A protein has these predicted regions:
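Hinge/lid segment of periplasmic solute-binding proteins
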Residues: 96-147, 186-189, 204-207, 211-214, ...
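Conserved C-terminal helix/tail region of periplasmic/extracytoplasmic solute-binding proteins
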Residues: 157, 381-438
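C-terminal lobe and pocket-closing loops
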Residues: 282-294, 305-403, 438
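Extracytoplasmic "Venus flytrap"/periplasmic binding protein-like
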Residues: 54-123, 154-165, 268-269, 276-277, ...
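Extracytoplasmic/periplasmic solute-binding protein
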Residues: 138-142, 147, 171-229
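Glycine-centered hinge/linker elements that transmit conformational signals in sensory
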Residues: 174, 225-258
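Short, low-complexity disordered leader/linker segments with a strong preference
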Residues: 1-38, 60, 425-438
């Protein structure tokens, strides 16, 4: 299998950037149909190794060669640059958060479920991850997941604190982790909450959304018929965000520097014993088992807020990109990736799975993982998870929300309602621009 180095990818990306500007029309391609299928994933080095094995198995079974390029940094920028040169990869595997933008730009093709072998084995709920605002499908589900709360169990037990089941207990635990020397080293060097709070890709909104929902608030409220209203400045949203502001600004239980952290930057701070509570996806379980120790941390459902325990539940999609000269091979790869064989290979990835919860109904989570923590994840996904609203393109809503929350948590105003009102006005304008306002 041929792989290009990150340097080569960067060089190609710069060349693409110089070739022209992106547009909302489908990208054309000058690809040779005899070349290998070019596949990109948003990956770390660890997950790239898992994908390599899966693609090798695909080639062994089908004879279709894959030119695999894991993208470690600036994924969205590199896709944009390739689109500008009208030479998109054949297949892209990335999170569902990219769906709206990919559709808007004309970068991904429509999926006909009935034409895809094995599509009937994909659970209906997972198909929602690939559905556009127009009701059509533009991505094939590959993996699903729900946010869970990771806690340093050894710290909690040392301080004789219960497993938190409510916001009040969670916040109390965060204060104790910050103030009561849970690691016993005699130093004031630990914090309660770890937050990937950068505005890049709207990460902070990804993290905060679960807590806003648990407080009874929302970023956007669905009104039916593909129409939405803004909920970010409602009394419930405001109260939920005030709670988070207090954790940042008054209790000071959040890891310093969190407002510039991406998820990849945040993970090592949990591993190194700097922070003890982490609301995140379950994909780090394997890595943390090795780096932190399986016996030193626990995986729990998010503690309940005033309105419940709802958390963000999304996943990864397989996008068959526009302009490909290899449409038959695109389809073959998508069909293989949703088979039980490929799904289980993705789940068993060491140290990190690329399939968290399977989309194929014939794959047994408990039998594959044999780990009660993954049963917890599956239970949360089934009963508490929800996606972001299916507006035509949620990216600008997530980005604007992230920027405002970042400002509130950094500046610590006594009253955040004015900034939330300004954000609400901006989101209303965006809804109007997307013709999705009530």
């Amino acid at each position: 299998m041929r792989r290009r180095t990150a340097t080569t990818i960067a060089t190609l990306s710069v060349a693409a950037l110089l070739a022209g500007c992106g547009s909302s029309t489908p990208a054309a391609s000058n690809k040779d149909p005899n070349k290998p299928l070019e596949v990109w994933t948003r990956s770390t080095e660890a997950t790239a190794k898992v994908y390599e094995k899966i693609f090798k198995s695909f080639t062994d079974k089908t004879g279709v060669k894959v030119d695999y390029k894991p993208i470690y940094n600036d994924f969205d920028k590199q896709v944009q640059q390739r689109a500008a040169s009208k030479d998109l990869p054949d297949v892209v595997i990335t999170d569902t958060g990219s769906l709206g933008n990919f559709v808007k730009q004309g970068w991904t093709t429509e999926i006909k479920r009935e034409d895809l072998a094995g599509s009937g084995d994909i659970v209906d709920r997972a198909w929602n991850n690939g559905k556009g605002a127009d009701g059509k499908y533009y991505g094939v589900p590959f993996s699903t997941q729900a946010m869970v709360t990771l806690i340093r169990k050894d710290w909690r037990e040392k301080l004789h604190k219960p497993i938190p089941t409510t916001w009040e207990e969670l916040d109390d635990l965060a204060r104790a982790f910050t103030r009561d020397d849970p690691d016993g080293n005699g130093q004031n060097d630990t914090y309660g909450m770890l937050v990937p709070g950068t505005v890049d890709r709207g990460y902070l909104a990804w993290w905060a959304a679960s807590y806003i929902w648990q407080g009874g608030g929302d970023i956007l409220e669905e009104e039916g018929g593909g129409k939405f209203s803004v909920g970010i400045d409602s009394p419930e949203s405001t109260k939920a965000i005030e709670r988070l502001r207090k954790l940042f600004c008054e209790d000071k239980v959040v890891q310093p520097g969190s407002l510039t952290l991406s998820t990849n930057d945040a993970h090592p701070l949990f591993e190194s014993g700097k922070s003890g509570i982490y609301l995140t996806g379950p994909y780090m379980i394997g890595r943390f088992d090795k780096s932190v120790g399986k016996d030193k941390y626990e995986v729990i459902a998010s503690p309940r807020g005033p309105a419940g325990a709802t958390v963000l539940g999304e996943g990864e999609d397989i996008y068959l990109m526009a302009g490909s000269a290899k449409t038959a091979d695109q389809k073959k790869l998508a069909e293989y990736l949703i088979t039980p064989e490929a799904q289980q290979a993705g789940m068993k990835g060491d140290p990190q799975p690329v399939v968290r919860l399977p989309v194929n109904k014939n794959v047994d989570v408990n039998a594959t993982y044999n780990d009660p923590r993954w049963a917890t994840v599956a239970g949360v996904y089934k009963s508490e998870a929800r996606p972001f609203p299916s507006v035509p393109n949620f990216t600008p809503f997530r980005q604007k929300t992230s920027e405002t929350l970042n400002s509130i948590f950094a500046k610590c105003p006594a009253d955040s309602s004015a900034e939330l009102k300004s954000l609400a006005d901006a989101l209303k304008k965006e809804l109007e621009n997307q013709k999705a306002s009530q």
